[in-house]
């Protein structure tokens, strides 16, 4: 699976259609006061679909990273208990099944990796291939550290344990930061709707004043500039 891509479901397409149609109607009414602008619906639809895919990729990678961090804890614990890395990874498959059920990105990855290992692929090779596909810095870093520790021998289990601890510390810190700024993000999203509310209020309460912005070239240019500035904000 390529985690830099997101396959939209029928539900996603339905949401995109509703959002893009609503946005097109709002643009036609508030910015141009002309139903002819509705012909721009395909452009708005493509733009909304692009945003949906980007958000889908972000959520997908966020979910994968969370599940991978839990796999690391299981892997480290199993190796400390005396399992080989291959057997520890097989045990991790069972743990992920219990934790997430079949609705798990990492479970399918672990199952495929275990199949590859049974076909005499090395764990380092399958881990490296997965890390490359994930596109996540934490997974790539762990893969590199794992390969280095495996080649160098010595305190292999200790290296994996300390690496897991450091990565979890970083992960927890990032989660706390996300929680701290989530209120600001919500506030920003709310602020994004204020220009639309103001424009709606002016159009409903001062139609004569706003009419100067519609039906002429200067008004079209001005409103188009405002729309582009709003879309880019």
Q: PLM features: residue spans?
A:
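Hydrophobic alpha-helical transmembrane segments in multi-pass membrane proteins
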Residues: 103, 124, 137, 141, ...
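Short, surface-exposed helix/turn micro-motifs that flank interaction/cofactor sites
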Residues: 89-90, 161, 181
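Hydrophobic residues in alpha-helical segments
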Residues: 30, 79, 117-118, 150, ...
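Juxtamembrane/interface alpha-helical elements of multi-pass membrane proteins
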Residues: 42-130, 140-148, 155-157
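Hydrophobic alpha-helical signal-anchor/transmembrane segments
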Residues: 1-70, 171-233
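Hydrophobic alpha-helical transmembrane segments
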Residues: 125-145, 160-178
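A short hydrophobic/aromatic micro-motif that marks alpha-helical segments and, especially, helix-coil
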Residues: 96-99, 150, 167-170, 198, ...
């Amino acid at each position: 699976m390529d985690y830099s891509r997101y396959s939209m479901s029928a539900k996603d397409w339905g949401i995109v259609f509703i959002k893009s149609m609503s946005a097109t109607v709002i643009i036609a009414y508030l910015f141009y006061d002309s139903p002819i602008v509705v012909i721009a619906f395909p452009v708005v639809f493509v733009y909304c679909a692009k945003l949906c895919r980007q958000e889908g990729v972000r959520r997908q990678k966020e979910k994968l990273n969370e599940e991978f961090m839990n796999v690391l804890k299981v892997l480290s614990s199993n190796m400390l208990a005396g399992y080989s890395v291959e057997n520890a990874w097989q045990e991790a498959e069972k743990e992920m099944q219990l934790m997430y059920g079949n609705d798990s990105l990492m479970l399918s990855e672990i199952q495929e990796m275990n199949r590859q290992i049974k076909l005499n692929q090395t764990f380092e090779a399958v881990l490296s291939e997965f890390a490359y596909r994930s596109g996540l810095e934490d997974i790539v870093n762990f893969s590199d550290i794992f390969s280095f520790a495996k080649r160098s021998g010595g305190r292999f289990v200790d290296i994996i344990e300390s690496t897991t601890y450091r990565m979890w510390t970083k992960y927890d810190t990032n989660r706390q930061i996300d929680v701290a700024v989530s209120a600001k993000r919500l506030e920003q999203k709310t602020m994004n709707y204020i220009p639309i509310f103001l424009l709606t209020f002016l159009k409903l309460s001062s139609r004569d004043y706003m009419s100067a912005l519609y039906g002429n070239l200067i008004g079209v240019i001005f409103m188009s500039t405002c729309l582009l500035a709003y879309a880019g904000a």
